[in-house]
């Protein structure tokens, strides 16, 4: 008994194609043999029977019941497909057009077209094979014509492909300009306005929501946020008057000069040290001297000589070469030149002081010159006078003979010049290609200034006031001849 089959089943002797892959049936007995297997395989398959039901059990196969087809043989080429296609027969896969490549039921004509045109991707071989799952290039065997794989990105979900619709902006009829909010109806607007509060400051009339008022107070009334207010004519006139007082006119310049002279007479000659980023760009700063080597060439040579002398192991390292000690030195110069930047980490073992200054006053100044912010006790540096052989009576003598400091200065100069020449020659020998860089090499080794501590920057006004008080005390001691050394009282009064 014949079993019911679907429309796509074939008669006995044909293998079903699960993926609609054409198969080759047995050749007819009358077909002439080919020279090679390829030409034999390229022959079109025989057409399927018109009826969908299977033949009876004792019947012969369809290939034997039908009359044999005469295949047209051409030497060296397969027969054309159109010559053996019968009505209702399915052409081979290679001969199908992309539009008519769908599987057709047995009862439908071949001129049927679907609403969406589909086509099957063909492999690179001559015969189409089953698609392999491990090949990502042929993972999807077919696509709609208008959604081709070359132009469509299937990695994105379909929701993202669609364009997002623009949301309609809400329409507000009531606005609060202070809070920058809008409301749709009068009730919400009235509720919001009832939540407005006033700024807690007395002179401020700002009203807004509580959170907005908090931001307003932080930005306008917080400590350190006070700004110039020129709302009334009186405030504008007061501000203009202050500007006129500080404007650098000739009268204001003369007035400032007089104030400066009065401070110098009192002994308050120090000013508050300025700290900031632009301090390194000043005229006498360390960075300015490095960037402009030509302007301070003499100063660099003097420092190089001093370093050469202090670096040597000779007996001249006990002297501080800051210049020849003057016979009539002003003790104010010791504290004027000693600001926060003059404190070095490495203190000299010995120092030369002027003859007029007494040991008690020198110890006071040396202990004061130490770092005030340090926790440890200030260490007193040992003081060595210029000439121990000369006694105190030579200080009182105005017509004293020439001090041996001049001979020491000449010896130091000759020694430093010889040292610098030897240093230059050794540098040229070791680096013959960098003779031109000797000047730059010499300017790099300059004394580093002391980096100010945070405590020094915070207490800069107090430090300036304290040092000015000490300078006034020193001035008073010299004028009144407190120690009984009537050296040059007349000259000190003129100062």
UniProtKB/Swiss-Prot annotation:
Question: Record's SMART domains?
Answer: ZnF_C2H2
**Free-text function comment from the UniProt entry:** Binds RNA.
Positions with biased composition (Basic and acidic residues): 416-431
Q: Where exactly are the zinc fingers annotated as C2H2-type?
A: 174-196
Keywords carried by this UniProt record: Metal-binding, Nucleus, Phosphoprotein, RNA-binding, Zinc, Zinc-finger
Which residues does this entry mark as bearing Phosphoserine?
Answer: 338, 340, 342, 403
One of the Pfam families matching this protein, by short name: NUFIP1
Question: Does the record bear Zinc in its keywords?
Answer: yes
Q: List every stretch annotated Disordered.
A: 1-108, 277-357, 413-435
Q: How does it assemble?
A: Interacts with FMR1. Interacts with ZNHIT3. Interacts with NOP2, NOP56 and RUVBL1.
Output this protein's name: FMR1-interacting protein NUFIP1
Where, per UniProt, does this protein localize?
A: Nucleus
Summed up, the tissue specificity of this protein is: Expressed in spleen, thymus, prostate, testis, ovary, small intestine, colon, peripheral blood leukocyte, heart, brain, placenta, lung, liver, skeletal muscle, kidney, and pancreas.
The GO biological-process annotations, alphabetized, read as: box C/D snoRNP assembly; positive regulation of transcription by RNA polymerase II; RNA processing
InterPro entries per record: NUFIP1-like, NUFIP1_cons_dom, Znf_C2H2_type
Q: Which GO terms describe its cellular component?
A: fibrillar center; nuclear matrix; nucleolus; nucleoplasm; nucleus; perichromatin fibrils; pre-snoRNP complex; presynaptic active zone
In its UniProt entry, the species of origin is given as Homo sapiens
Keyword Ribonucleoprotein assigned to the entry: answer is no
Q: Where is this motif: Bipartite nuclear localization signal?
A: 243-260
Compositional bias segments (type: Polar residues):
98-108
